[in-house]
């Protein structure tokens, strides 16, 4: 296998998530050789992280033409993901694209077609929740049949960073982030994690969406995600994306015999006061259940009807041996959000370095395309008040 430190990455985007990718790559020893964004932000990011090549004025095509970049990380706003993904594939670069893959299924289908061409580079979509050891453990338990036949799944993804009408981010605008904001932005992480655990995709949905702040306020200029702004300097605008979503899902046939035809329900909110980033899910089967919450990332609760419930911790004998390869620290040393990104990047880069011989546990272009199709079905269902096939 080619050593990971010989691979070179270029990152497009300098907002909140771009530096998360850079940090993950640095921890793996991957060379980050190029950064692309606005000239000011790209230079500042390069100086902070010691990145040698800077491509300002959002000139991503120049970065993709660089012989010093093997893998392109696309961490730019949603509306340009498809354009940049297609350009990266055409330039012969492997791609790690932030979710969502694109704004519409019609355009993401083009990425799938390009990524599936013979000899095309590796393409991954960053649904990194797959790489929490707890999620991998839940997947192993389901696939072994430890929980029996899976009956249903329930859970939520709650945040509060857009609780106030004066909270602002470009994702609030359908023209920038897409028509489905809460479900599309964070809910798809929940849905992808469940799909990964079950080994099955959602085939139909019934959804209710609600926008509580019909009028919001935005700053006069640009600002970074989570940055604070004086409300007195803000301007009102009509918000056209949802704050909350409740989604019922029916999953199709699983890759194994324990999780076909599963029903699920999820509540998604970005206005849940007090919850900063709570992704919780429970898998319920005929023999037992297992529950997990991102805010306690190293623990899962196993439930039985006729036996005592158990709390299993990462780094102990309760977790499967094959999960150990996705953890770097001993039990009692929590691994969280940054570590899931690191493990996702490790899986992608090992797949590249091995000539595609290592397992591709990461989400592919096809997976990203399916999530965009699902988001379109959620929108259609909420408007029609009926079940819609994905």
PLM region spans:
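N-terminal Rossmann-like dinucleotide-binding module
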Residues: 1-50
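Hydrophobic residues in well-ordered beta-strands that form the structural core
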Residues: 56, 97, 103, 123-125, ...
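Glycine-rich phosphate/pyrophosphate-binding beta-alpha loops
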Residues: 188, 267-276
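Beta-loop-alpha module in the N-terminal Rossmann-like domain of NAD(P)-dependent dehydrogenases
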Residues: 51-114
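C-terminal helix-rich "cap/oligomerization" subdomain common to oxidoreductases
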Residues: 1-6, 71-73, 116, 296, ...
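Glycine-centered short loops/turns at secondary-structure junctions
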Residues: 29, 92, 119-120, 145, ...
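C-terminal glycine/acidic-rich active-site capping loop/insertion
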Residues: 214-240, 246-258, 281-282, 286-362, ...
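Predominantly a Rossmann-like dinucleotide-binding segment in NAD(P)-dependent oxidoreductases
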Residues: 121, 129-239, 300, 385
